[in-house]
Amino acid sequence: SVTAEKDRLRSGLGYARLILPIWGAFLNETIDDLTVQFEENGQVIVNELDKVVLSKGAWTTILFRYQQWQPEKDCFGPDMYVIRRYKKAGGEYRQQSKFNISSADQARKIVDALSSWIN
């Protein structure tokens, strides 16, 4: 059911338009269609700020920067980050996995580690 699918999304498996064909809204036929932006009843719940495509092809990896709506504060929370992997099958992209970067501090540690390995 649509309600069960929305609950599954909210449980941490991800907000993405790729699920919305169930609701008759979008298909993810191109990389540009992939997003973490999510609205409910006209209210933006997840506001995508930016995305960087890390790899393209049958398997696509995207880094998203976003904010989540905090109804108790009536504003968006701090910037958050997620890396998602998509597989293109049957003409559309489907999310296969994700890694949530839990804080700006964790993001800095990832950047520092990669920088030290690459340089």
Task: Identify what each model region corresponds to.
Residues S1-F26:
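Short, Lys/Arg-enriched N-terminal segments with co-localized hydrophobic residues
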Residues L18-R108, D112-N119:
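Positively charged, low-complexity terminal tracts
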